[in-house]
Amino acid sequence: DGPAPLTGLALARRIAHTTYRSPAELEHRFGREENRGESTVGGSLGEPRGRYAIESYLDHHGAKLVERFDANSYLAVNEALISHDVARGRGTLAQALAHTDCEWTIAAVNTDRLFFPHESHRLAEALPTPVPVDIIESNHGHDGFLIEAKQVEKILARALGVEDESATPSEAQREREALDSMTR
């Protein structure tokens, strides 16, 4: 309800986006590069300065989210994520998971700064029957699970029991999906 916190949503997205990618990737892509034709050295206090390329990149992602996502809904989703606790009222994590009877597949990105691999191992160890954690090797941080399609494909194919090549998406289909995701 009420006015949407659009500026705050864009800023939150800028900050969050720095955790979706690894420091190594951001350094490789942007380093200390200035926007073309701009100097990042300001004259005096309060005088405008040029911007770094990373700032434009982050602004772009902030503006993109504001255009496609309701800011108040974003607040509600964030609250749900922050307050969720599978063990609440059930004791420890192991006690909460003790009666699960599904098959689990757990994967982690080695450079993820949102969901650290050790947390995935903790989850796997808390299951009634521990399962291995598949580690996705990526220089892309959290978004590695979106970018490292071949690794994720193998993990999912094994989990679904469709490890033969005919059951996996074709290269052309993967390229179409990648292009679609870039234009969203």
Describe the predicted segments one by one.
Residues 100, 106-108:
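Short beta-strand/loop motif that positions the catalytic acidic residue
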Residues 7, 66, 73, 96, ...:
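Secondary-structure capping and boundary motifs in well-ordered enzyme cores
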Residues 89-94, 102-103, 113-126:
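Short alpha-helix in the alpha/beta-hydrolase fold that links the catalytic acid
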Residues 1-64:
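Alpha/beta-hydrolase-fold enzymes
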